């Protein structure tokens, strides 16, 4: 613990907590201040002027990042169609389960996957396992593209590097935008892709400043403030 605390202290000393950095400067710092021996995740935290109690201000979805997330994702497609199964495997699916196999595995808590992709007609079956899948973030959702009439397309997008985003009850979106071993321009482009989408999705009922705060951090590193006056 002492070593981790010392590393974190040294990392924090590299960051001026009163300064708002440009996106490029922030991505350079997030790489320098990550003190893990492995490539850590880079997460963007976007605080928005939202009241998520209102239905039209609940932002949730997914975006394909131009340089991917850097994270390997194990994708399961549940289908009883041999054609869908073949296309999904070709698109990069790691597992194919029939509906019977899916239920068998869910009953014994065999969660050997990171994402489930299904066709809309299978959602009533998955709904029975909501208490198991929901807390693990595994329940498919149309907004994130994991409930789709074209599972193979969903698989291809996930494998390409799809990042989910969701505003919490405080109006803050936390999203993975890459790994610390990625180049600064790649992280910047990924961040801009997400930020442009969030800006475009601004609800019409939001008054005043939409963006309230913007920070980036590595999984093991300090939080770095980013300028957002130009968003």
Swiss-Prot record:
Keywords: Repressor, Ribonucleoprotein, Ribosomal protein, RNA-binding, rRNA-binding, Translation regulation, tRNA-binding
CDD domains for this protein: Ribosomal_L1
Gene3D superfamilies membership: 3.30.190.20, 3.40.50.790
GO biological process terms held by the UniProt record: regulation of translation; translation
One cellular component term from this protein's GO annotations in UniProt: large ribosomal subunit
GO MF terms held by the record: rRNA binding; structural constituent of ribosome; tRNA binding
Listed PROSITE patterns: RIBOSOMAL_L1
Membership in a protein family: Belongs to the universal ribosomal protein uL1 family.
Subunit structure: Part of the 50S ribosomal subunit.
InterPro entries associated with the record: Ribosom_uL1_bac-type, Ribosomal_uL1, Ribosomal_uL1-like, Ribosomal_uL1/biogenesis, Ribosomal_uL1_3-a/b-sand, Ribosomal_uL1_CS
Entry function: Binds directly to 23S rRNA. The L1 stalk is quite mobile in the ribosome, and is involved in E site tRNA release. Protein L1 is also a translational repressor protein, it controls the translation of the L11 operon by binding to its mRNA.
Annotated protein name in UniProt: Large ribosomal subunit protein uL1
Annotated SUPFAM superfamilies: Ribosomal protein L1 (SSF56808)
HAMAP family: Ribosomal_uL1_B
Name of a matching Pfam family: Ribosomal_L1
